Amino acid sequence: EQLIELVGPWKTVYIVHFNGET
């Protein structure tokens, strides 16, 4: 449960960061 809450916003940040690097 706690992991999902942390992964929620983290996933978005990771996608945005990866998209900006490409």
From Swiss-Prot:
Disulfide bonds: none annotated. The N-terminus is blocked. It comes from the Eukaryota. The keyword Isomerase does not apply. One of its GO terms (biological process) is sensory perception of smell. Keywords: Olfaction, Sensory transduction, Transport. Homodimer. Belongs to the calycin superfamily. Lipocalin family. Binds the chemical odorant, 2-isobutyl-3-methoxypyrazine. This is Odorant-binding protein 1. It comes from Oryctolagus cuniculus (Rabbit). The lineage of its organism: Eukaryota, Metazoa, Chordata, Craniata, Vertebrata.
